């Protein structure tokens, strides 16, 4: 697959009449964004150098079963990073996010934050088919093994034709 040459993507609420979301920073609110659903998948936990619970680490390169074109460059492998992103060409262990594009990271970041899944605070997991790769950071805590605020985020990349995504959601 290939990402469209756009810099802004937006989440479209499929039921705006039922939406009553308002966010006030620091209010300890729990928010949810549902951008579609995937079929049932079989996942494998990601280990970083054989270790499941890590802070600021990267695993890879992991071979993709297809060629993925990202901003005009073809990639056949990916790095899964513990802080909520995947990168191409090299791993990324920085816990502090930077602006995009920054010129050095070929990255897709569904939620780049200082995740720390130590102490049983969630896990990164992967599912791969012949035409897709799904990475989910599932119920991960934040820095210093904190478990009171957790995030789950997912990134899906495909060959551009995969039926794993609903019709119209593959870009190419």
Predicted regions mapped to residue ranges:
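Von Willebrand factor type D
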Residues: 1-172
């Amino acid at each position: 697959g290939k990402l469209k040459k756009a810099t802004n993507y937006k989440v479209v609420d499929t039921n705006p009449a039922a939406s009553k979301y308002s966010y006030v920073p620091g209010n300890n609110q729990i928010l949810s964004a549902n951008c579609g659903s995937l079929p049932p998948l079989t996942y494998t936990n990601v280990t970083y150098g054989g270790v499941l619970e890590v802070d600021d680490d990267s695993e890879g390169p992991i071979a993709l079963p297809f060629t993925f074109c990202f901003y005009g460059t073809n990639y056949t492998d990916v790095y899964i990073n513990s802080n909520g992103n995947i990168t191409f060409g090299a791993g990324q262990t920085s816990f502090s996010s930077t602006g995009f594009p920054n010129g050095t990271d070929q990255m897709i970041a569904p939620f780049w934050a200082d995740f720390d899944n130590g102490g049983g605070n969630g896990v990164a997991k992967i599912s791969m088919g012949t035409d897709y790769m799904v990475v989910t950071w599932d119920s991960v805590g934040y820095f210093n093994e904190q478990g009171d605020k957790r995030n789950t985020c997912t990134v899906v990349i495909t060959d551009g034709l995969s039926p794993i995504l609903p019709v119209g959601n593959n870009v190419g």
